[in-house]
A protein has these predicted regions:
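Edge beta-strands of extracellular beta-sandwich domains
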Residues: 2-7
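Extracellular/secretory pathway-exposed regions associated with glycan biology
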Residues: 8-90, 95-174
Length: 174
């Protein structure tokens, strides 16, 4: 028999957008080198490189997908900033990243999973405008799958739409 799936229905009010002055395009990314198997291990990291990225794909842009990753120096990254939600509504969110947070709420937690296909999609009611965003990427071989081969993207789908769309650079700010 197949695995039982539990679906929780929760009535939500729209999470209000943030009033932020002087935003610039992109996200702030902090990257640390080392082999980390879970988010808690990142607290031990002492050397972080800070940069600005225009797109979530830049988290692992220098990795040649579908090639050997033996030459890749292991690293993990945290990208923070804001996501601009185009209109009020309930949004379904999907990602193969380790974690995705919106407005300080952990929405996607792929801890302990092979990051090949997201199994922890979720939804949240969001008002139009800027919302805090945090994306955690753990670069490693987890469950036999190199996370470096994943696209470090987030997909959104408004509840009245049929298809997910990528979060695009014009939606990201810091």
């Amino acid at each position: 028999m197949s695995q039982t799936r539990t679906i929780t229905v929760e009535k939500q009010t729209l999470a209000p957008a943030k009033e932020v002055a002087n935003v610039t395009p992109g996200l702030i990314m902090e990257k640390t080198y080392g082999s980390f198997l879970n988010v808690n291990e990142l607290a031990k990291a002492t050397d972080w490189e800070k940069s600005t990225i225009k797109d979530l794909a830049e988290i692992n842009k220098n990795i040649v997908r579908w090639r050997s990753i033996r030459a890749v120096k292991p690293y993990s990254a945290i990208a923070t900033g804001y996501i601009n939600i185009p209109e009020d509504g309930v949004y379904f969110i999907s990602s193969n990243n380790e974690e995705v947070w919106i407005d300080g709420k952990l929405l996607i937690n792929n801890a302990g999973e092979t990051k090949r296909f997201s199994r922890h999609d979720t939804s949240i009611a969001l008002a139009k405008g800027l919302h805090e965003l945090k994306v955690v990427f753990l670069g490693n071989r987890l469950g036999g799958w190199p996370t470096y081969w994943n696209l470090c993207e987030i997909e959104l789908r408004k509840s009245d739409n049929d298809k997910f769309v990528w979060v695009t650079p014009d939606m990201l700010f810091h």
